[in-house]
């Protein structure tokens, strides 16, 4: 590589995707590879933020960690299983289904309104972002609204695909009982397309 970090002539500088480039196994090659990985994630995150304006971890959740969640739930033993599941997902990248004993790469917390599901999930997405992964935190109503608003300007498919391909997504208030009105076929289709793709 002559200390360029590349094997061959294809480089991201020249507009080739990282998949097309061959990075050298030497120390320089690994530094160059890590640089382009960080740059790729930063671009993906910036694109996500353009497509879903305001979609990020809300300020009042940003300081939540596993330790702070455990401390908040110290007198609520019924939350232990959910917190343990989030910790397992952070630690090993999957959760063992307690019923089927199969491993799942996704994590869903269900329960009544105001029980702390969102706060409990926060450390998972924070950890992923800190590890250099792209992420999307968005309420389902805002997500569906963003897709539907894309019908007017032709960005609905681009937005849906971005949400499908982001490294980590936190959909808040999925199945919100307090929402007025029945679920429309369009809303169901949008949510199905996202969940089915990621499943």
Which residues does each PLM region occupy?
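Pre-Walker A (pre-P-loop) alpha-helix and adjacent loop at the N terminus of AAA/AAA+ ATPase modules
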Residues: 55-60, 67-107
């Amino acid at each position: 590589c002559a200390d360029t970090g590349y094997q061959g002539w294809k480089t991201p500088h020249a507009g080739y995707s990282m998949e097309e480039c061959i990075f050298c196994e030497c120390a320089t090659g690994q530094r160059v590879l890590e640089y382009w990985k960080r740059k790729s994630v930063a671009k993906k995150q910036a694109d996500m933020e353009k497509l879903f304006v305001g979609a990020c971890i809300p300020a009042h959740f940003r300081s939540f960690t596993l330790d702070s969640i455990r401390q908040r739930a110290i007198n609520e033993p019924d939350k232990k299983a959910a917190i343990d599941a989030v910790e397992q997902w952070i630690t090993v990248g999957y959760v063992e289904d307690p019923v089927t004993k199969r491993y799942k790469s996704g994590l869903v917390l269900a329960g009544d309104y105001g029980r702390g599901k969102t706060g409990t999930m926060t450390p998972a997405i924070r950890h992923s972002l800190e590890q250099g992964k792209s992420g999307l935190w968005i309420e389902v109503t805002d997500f569906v609204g963003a897709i539907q608003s894309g019908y007017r300007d032709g960005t609905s498919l681009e937005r849906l695909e971005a949400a499908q391909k982001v490294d980590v997504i936190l959909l808040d208030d999925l199945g919100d009982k307090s929402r007025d009105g029945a679920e429309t076929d369009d809303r169901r289709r949008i949510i199905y397309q996202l969940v089915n793709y990621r499943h």
